[in-house]
């Protein structure tokens, strides 16, 4: 996969070139192309923004340098803009993007883009209901979530399939040595009846409990089987007893 990122601050993307993603870059499992669209300005001071027509606070990013930067690429693949008004990024989107051969991200700044820049994009995406100073951090998050799904990026190929969100449920609490640390034990907090059912049903009940405790909204978007509904009710009954 090739990923192009149009940005005013290419130095911000150093974190994508270390750890597992960095090793993937070195091994040729994916390619990162950082493009500073300020390089495509024509005026003496290299302006990339201007005041909005009709007045208003802030500055708006111009279409010309961004369009020229896009035109300089041999290909773009799917073009993605980061902006607060976009649809919220999630694991399902990362899985779909990981199937693409090429992605191009355009990072916003200041008061946003000239509307004609949005018209160039295939998707406008946000990472949540809050405002950041620019699109670089959201882009890094989305690139990380997408690239880690590519074959050979993670050490354990099963990790990206079995972890939180990939199956619509959160991971259950996990522990390692020591078994007892400052009086806090690593024993699982399930009653015997629940443990028996866990043995019969794999880890489903632990996943359901973790999701119910921390992100019940995820259960609303999941089509639970009759068996899962039964397990969930038992979890609720158990917690009410406590």
Swiss-Prot record:
It is an enzyme of class 2 (transferase). One of its GO terms (molecular function) is tRNA (guanine(37)-N1)-methyltransferase activity. Keywords: Cytoplasm, Methyltransferase, S-adenosyl-L-methionine, Transferase, tRNA processing. GO terms for biological process: tRNA N1-guanine methylation. It is found in: Cytoplasm. It holds the Pfam family tRNA_m1G_MT. It catalyses: guanosine(37) in tRNA + S-adenosyl-L-methionine = N(1)-methylguanosine(37) in tRNA + S-adenosyl-L-homocysteine + H(+). It comes from the Bacteria. Its EC number is 2.1.1.228. GO terms for cellular component: cytosol. InterPro entries: Alpha/beta_knot_MTases, tRNA_m1G_MeTrfase_C_sf, tRNA_m1G_MeTrfase_TrmD, tRNA_m1G_MTases_N, tRNA_MeTrfase_TRMD/TRM10. PANTHER family: TRNA (GUANINE-N(1)-)-METHYLTRANSFERASE. Belongs to the RNA methyltransferase TrmD family. Homodimer. Specifically methylates guanosine-37 in various tRNAs. NCBIfam families: PRK00026.1, trmD. This is tRNA (guanine-N(1)-)-methyltransferase. It comes from Lactobacillus acidophilus (strain ATCC 700396 / NCK56 / N2 / NCFM).
């Amino acid at each position: 996969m090739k990923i192009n990122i149009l940005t005013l601050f290419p130095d911000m993307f150093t974190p994508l070139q270390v750890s597992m993603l960095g090793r993937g870059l070195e091994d040729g499992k994916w390619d990162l192309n950082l493009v500073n669209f300020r390089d495509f300005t024509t005026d003496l001071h290299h302006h990339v923004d201007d005041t909005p027509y009709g007045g208003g606070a802030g500055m708006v990013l111009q279409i010309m340098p961004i369009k020229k930067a896009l035109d300089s690429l041999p290909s773009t693949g799917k073009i993605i803009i980061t902006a607060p008004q976009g649809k919220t990024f999630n694991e399902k989107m990362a899985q779909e993007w990981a199937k693409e051969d090429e992605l191009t991200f355009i990072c916003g700044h200041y008061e946003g883009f000239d509307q004609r820049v949005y018209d160039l994009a295939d998707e406008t995406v946000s990472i949540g209901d809050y405002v950041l100073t620019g699109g670089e951090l959201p882009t890094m998050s989305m690139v990380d979530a997408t690239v880690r799904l590519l074959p050979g990026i993670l050490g354990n190929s099963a990790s990206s399939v079995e972890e939180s969100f990939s199956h619509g449920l959160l991971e259950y609490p996990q522990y390692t040595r020591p078994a007892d640390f400052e009086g806090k034990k690593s024993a699982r907090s399930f009653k015997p009846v629940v443990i028996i059912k866990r043995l019969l049903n794999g880890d489903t009940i632990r996943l359901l409990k973790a999701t119910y405790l921390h992100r019940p909204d995820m259960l609303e978007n999941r089509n639970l089987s009759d068996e899962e509904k039964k397990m969930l009710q038992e979890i609720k009954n158990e917690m009410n007893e406590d």
